[in-house]
Amino acid sequence: MNIHEYQAKRLLHEYGAPIANGVAVYSIEQAEKWAKKLPGPLYVVKSQIHAGGRGKGQFKELGPDAKGGVRLAQSVEEVVANVQEMLGKTLVTKQTGPEGKQVNRLYIEDGADIERELYLSLLVDRSVGRIAFVVSTEGGMDIETVAEETPEKIFTLPIDVTEGVTSADCARLCDALELHDSAREDGEKLFPILYKAFCEKDMSLLEINPLIVMKDGHLRVLDAKVSFDNNALFRHPDILELRDLSEEDPKEIEASKHDLAYVALEGTIGCMVNGAGLAMATMDIIKLYGAEPANFLDVGGGASKEKVTAAFKIITADPNVKGILVNIFGGIMRCDVIAEGVVAAVREVGLKVPLVVRLEGTNVEQGKAIINDSGLNVIPADDLDDAAQKIVAAVKGA
């Protein structure tokens, strides 16, 4: 689960991280009211959407010469003018896709006198089985670009979970970020704080880009991105309250209600598969034969008829879907249950696109019989290769 920048900053501030004064606003009236309470004279107006690249983004409704989704203002009047221009508009960034995201809230905060911009993140390093700091002196830009062009400028430090962040760890991080004097003292306080927040709140990613050294020599968290482990949200009701459903795909929200692993993609062939590995293989072979998957959908190993029906409805709710491939290898999951769910769903929502079903494993003959006896226009397939070729051909011929 992702949260907005202003929510991430508030959370980190509760642990003691240094942030600027700021307030989230939802209207022009709120913007004017709260901007007057900030010290100024420099303000930053930030679009709040779940996507990066906001500063370089473009609003669909504005001209190509308009400013992006993060703007500086020299007065309260400029703040209000920017809010009026940005609020309710659709911001397109490299992470939103061409459809963009509507800006329903803005974050207004004090400006900062920046001396240097740094990069810092915490993540789970699966190669060593530890939480690791990833830092760089090249902040304020895409870390992927830094990794590609100047990988030597990235320093990774796995943390021993039994010891936590030690003074030696802090020293190594400070050295990597070239922190001195007041900034070094701030860093020695900040690193353990961030690690504690990451662990206690079950984060999957904590990214600060940039972490700045101000002209007065102190550190400040200038931007923050936080993601949480969905599997741990049951023990964090306070975090769940921060969820912004308007930022999520409605189909993914519906899938989560049925405990389905669903990710919307941009292709035309809907996929319903059991098992993440088989789901990825299914998407790969669809691409191999010249088409694109419309989604990743894993119904899991013990799905019921109702769960399968819900999964089918979610797939058919996507207007981009021109064909559906059901690929089931029954182990724990029984093929007859899948077949009953597919038949029930098709009868309920109708079938307006080609449907290919490949079943193998437990109760496969019963499953095939259920589909054959249903009278539905379903294309059977013998194996994965056969299934992929048939659905791609059906979609291209439609």
From Swiss-Prot:
Catalysed reaction, written as an equation: succinate + ATP + CoA = succinyl-CoA + ADP + phosphate; GTP + succinate + CoA = succinyl-CoA + GDP + phosphate
Ranges annotated as spanning the membrane: none
Lineage: Bacteria, Pseudomonadati, Pseudomonadota, Alphaproteobacteria, Hyphomicrobiales
GN (gene name): sucC
Pathway field: Carbohydrate metabolism; tricarboxylic acid cycle; succinate from succinyl-CoA (ligase route): step 1/1
Pfam families with a match to the protein in the record: ATP-grasp_2, Ligase_CoA
Keywords carried by this UniProt record: ATP-binding, Ligase, Magnesium, Metal-binding, Nucleotide-binding, Tricarboxylic acid cycle
Cofactor comment text: Binds 1 Mg(2+) ion per subunit.
Positions with a binding annotation for Mg(2+): 209, 223
List of residues binding substrate: 274, 331-333
Protein role: Succinyl-CoA synthetase functions in the citric acid cycle (TCA), coupling the hydrolysis of succinyl-CoA to the synthesis of either ATP or GTP and thus represents the only step of substrate-level phosphorylation in the TCA. The beta subunit provides nucleotide specificity of the enzyme and binds the substrate succinate, while the binding sites for coenzyme A and phosphate are found in the alpha subunit.
Domain of life assignment: Bacteria
Gene Ontology terms describing biological process: succinyl-CoA metabolic process; tricarboxylic acid cycle
Molecular-function GO terms, alphabetical: ATP binding; magnesium ion binding; succinate-CoA ligase (ADP-forming) activity; succinate-CoA ligase (GDP-forming) activity
Protein's recorded name: Succinate--CoA ligase [ADP-forming] subunit beta
Gene Ontology annotations for the cellular component aspect, listed alphabetically: cytosol; succinate-CoA ligase complex
